């Protein structure tokens, strides 16, 4: 999710101008050209060794790795088109949400949580284009904690332990942050020479520098590398940015493939997996309105994401038999597909500050467009995110449990579009925040539960493949997830009591819903948290290792069918999910290559 609610050029009124200017210059001077795979010509009945369904973060990486084996023919199916020019520009990372490049998923109203949000639902944006969510995310490079992967190993097999997955993280990574490279201790956990560049923050004069100082005043230790597994505190995140441009499994891996044996078919939406007995043999798809049947000699690999992967499996007869029977779908394999959904839970806290708090030394939008187009520099060329980790009370001090992600909204920049459509708040809350933002800057502190116990589920709305899946978040179904929120929020809003923010006249904006105002603490905060809960857009777990899949990501009880994307995660990792998804794709590629080495 964009924790930096106001920290990008695409968040304010200038977004339309900036995007239009970039499109004009890109068209006339080819300054933002990216060489995407050309559209393949695929006829009905075509046969490949492997079919990969979904050209997102996992699918792009997996298809690229399989294409390294010249003996394999690979077809990659992607429901969306190439990304637009804005996708490449880090400073425009907000502009693609709520557009045709976004699946625009929402959860089902459960009548209990998120009742202070518009329509009582949580937004779940996902990339509908090559690169998937890796083409519209915040580019934060995070892996989770070693404890997450030891937990996976206990569930799914030792191949998923921290020591092993670390090798795969390092394989894909090209670390370029000189502060980390110079530190031998930190470099034990990083790679150089991998496909995807991981770079440091570039602007020490940003508002985040003052926020870092404020967190240190509150007792957080300064951390040089937020992926370092044995120290937590406050620090700047690394990002997947190369030379002022978004770097991803699409730009760094799929776009570099030269093999003629990899075919990419865009605007092609898989509607059903084809089976002969218990073996997956192909895919039925809608390709630009054409009903297409394609076949796989060895395997179909589903990489359609946490929401579309279970939908496709269910429509194909793989899932809980009671759900399949409810929709009169023939049961191919009875498995807990769609069960086990998890996401990081987030609550936004707002504080006001004097004008100028959010100002960068290079703040003129027009100048920065020219600067970016001229040499790829300026504020459009970077993402400057920081975070502060809190351990669980009475647990190990180096294992994060909550995170606080602060950001800054300049005066007058919180538009209705960003507040209502972007965040999902009701118009009443947005009117209050916009009134505050007319005269003041807003400091936003996103408090995020990193290790939820609650689980939701994903199921079908109908037999129509064009219908979105039904997403039940399950937020706070496990009462333990509420524990710690009041304390974490208190820590976040105590920023107003630090030296720097006292000077700025900072104060907390009270967003307590009317239904919670009569309660005493901590029940009042708990009520507010439940009502204001947002998804952090890191959903996982709907085709889990150990339940739906074996240790090598093969669907249990079936042949020729594998899953590789965020849906395979058996439990939530303590951090953003993009890098772990690339790691999963790397492991899937090795599993497949090893299985078919002599075939």
UniProtKB/Swiss-Prot annotation:
An example Gene Ontology molecular-function term: flavin adenine dinucleotide binding
The protein's enzyme class: oxidoreductase
Reaction catalysed by this enzyme: ecdysone + O2 = 3-dehydroecdysone + H2O2
Keyword NADP appears in the UniProt entry: no
This protein's record includes keyword Calcium: no
Keyword vocabulary terms for this entry: FAD, Flavoprotein, Oxidoreductase
Active site, per annotation: 538 (proton acceptor)
Binding-site positions, FAD: 137-140, 537-538
EC number, as in UniProt: 1.1.3.16
Disulfide bonds: none
Pfam families on file: GMC_oxred_C, GMC_oxred_N
Coiled-coil intervals, chain numbering: none
Induction (UniProt): Induced by RH-5992, which is an ecdysone agonist used as insecticide.
Cofactor(s) in the UniProt record: FAD
Family classification: Belongs to the GMC oxidoreductase family.
Function: Involved in the inactivation of ecdysteroid molting hormones by converting ecdysteroids into 3-dehydroecdysteroids.
Protein name per its UniProtKB record: Ecdysone oxidase
């Amino acid at each position: 999710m964009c924790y930096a609610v106001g920290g990008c050029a695409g968040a304010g009124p200038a977004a339309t101008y900036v995007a239009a200017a970039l499109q004009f210059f890109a068209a006339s001077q080819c300054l933002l050209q990216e060489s995407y795979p050309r559209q393949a010509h695929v006829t009905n009945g075509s046969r490949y060794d492997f079919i990969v369904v979904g050209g997102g973060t996992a699918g792009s990486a997996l298809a690229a790795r399989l294409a390294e084996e010249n003996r394999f023919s690979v077809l990659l199916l992607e429901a969306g088109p190439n990304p637009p020019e804005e996708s490449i520009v880090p400073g425009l990372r907000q502009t693609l949400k709520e557009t045709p490049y976004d699946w625009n998923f929402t959860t089902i109203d459960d009548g209990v949580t998120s009742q202070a949000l518009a329509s009582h639902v949580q937004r779940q944006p996902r990339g509908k284009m090559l690169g998937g969510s890796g083409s519209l995310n915040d580019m934060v490079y995070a892996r989770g904690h070693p404890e997450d992967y030891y937990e996976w190993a206990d569930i799914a097999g030792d191949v998923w332990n921290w020591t092993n997955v670390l090798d795969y993280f390092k394989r894909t990574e090209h670390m370029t942050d000189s502060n980390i490279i110079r530190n031998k201790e930190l470099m034990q956990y990083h790679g150089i020479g991998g496909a995807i560049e991981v770079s440091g923050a570039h602007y020490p004069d940003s508002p985040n520098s003052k926020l870092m100082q404020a967190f240190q005043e509150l007792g957080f230790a300064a951390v040089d590398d937020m992926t370092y597994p044995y120290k937590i505190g406050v620090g700047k995140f690394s990002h997947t940015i190369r030379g002022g441009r978004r770097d991803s499994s699409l730009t760094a891996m799929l776009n570099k493939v030269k093999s003629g044996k990899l075919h990419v078919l865009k605007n092609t939406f898989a509607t059903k997996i084809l089976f002969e007995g218990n073996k997956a043999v192909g895919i039925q798809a809608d390709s630009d309105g054409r009903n297409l049947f394609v076949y796989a000699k060895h395997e179909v690999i589903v990489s359609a994401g946490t929401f579309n992967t279970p939908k496709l499996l269910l429509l194909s007869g793989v899932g809980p038999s009671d759900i399949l029977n409810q929709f009169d779908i023939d049961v191919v394999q009875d498995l807990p597909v769609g069960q086990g959904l998890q996401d990081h839970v987030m609550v936004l806290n707002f504080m006001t500050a004097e004008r100028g708090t959010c100002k960068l030394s290079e703040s003129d939008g027009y100048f920065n467009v020219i600067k970016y187009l001229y040499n790829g520099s300026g504020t459009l060329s970077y993402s400057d995110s920081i975070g502060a980790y809190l351990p669980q009370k009475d647990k190990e001090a180096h294992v994060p449990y909550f995170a606080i992600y602060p950001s800054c909204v300049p005066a007058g920049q919180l538009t209705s579009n960003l507040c209502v459509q972007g965040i999902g708040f009701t118009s009443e809350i947005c009117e209050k925040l916009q009134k505050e933002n007319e005269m003041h800057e807003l400091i936003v502190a996103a408090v995020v539960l990193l290790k939820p116990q609650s689980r939701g589920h994903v199921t079908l709305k109908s037999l129509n493949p064009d219908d979105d899946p039904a997403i039940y978040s399950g937020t706070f179904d496990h009462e333990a997830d509420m524990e710690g929120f009041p304390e974490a929020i208190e820590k976040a809003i105590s920023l107003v009591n630090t030296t720097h923010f006292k000077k700025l006249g900072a104060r907390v904006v009270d967003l307590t819903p009317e239904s919670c105002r009569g309660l005493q603490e901590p029940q009042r905060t708990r009520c507010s948290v439940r009502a204001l809960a947002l998804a952090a857009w890191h959903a996982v777990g709907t085709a889990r290792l150990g339940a739906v899949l074996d240790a090598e990501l093969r669907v249990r009880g079936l042949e020729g069918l594998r899953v590789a994307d965020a849906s395979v995660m058996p439990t939530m990792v303590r951090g953003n999910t993009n890098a772990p998804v690339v790691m999963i794709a790397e492991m899937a590629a090795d599993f497949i290559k090893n299985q078919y080495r002599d075939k």
